Amino acid sequence: MDTSLAIALLGLAGSLLAAVVTYWLSKQKDLEAERRKEKLTYYKAFIESLNGIVEGDATPEGHLAFSRATNNLLLFAPQIVLAALNAFRSEISSSNAVNRTQEKHDALLAELLLAIRKDVGVLPVDERATFRPVLWTSGAPRNVT
């Protein structure tokens, strides 16, 4: 085989390989961005569902939305998020009404939100010692019929 032909074929093969690798890396980046976007959508739905279970604004529909949102997290959330979620759900469970405390609720909510924020890559990294999330109620009067 002629040397110049071999060099041309090697150049062609190298160019094709570079194009394939570039395409593959680009596709992987797109897929990861789509996964991140979907994960954020589920996390937002979970945070929004907290509104339906906050004392003073809680409704049966809110509890159903919370249940659905937390169950959806089982699809993709890392184990640290699921462990924090399970601890939080146990604390707020109706079967734990006698032992429930605001302090434990707040601490478990903070742990859960810290795990979620870490999973989505919130920067700068939160300071665990000072992270104190507070859920707000609407304060709107409820229509009682």
Predicted features, each with a name:
Residues 1-12:
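Feature marks short, highly hydrophobic, charge-poor N-terminal signal-anchor/signal peptide-like helices
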Residues 6, 17-145:
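Conserved non-transmembrane functional hotspots
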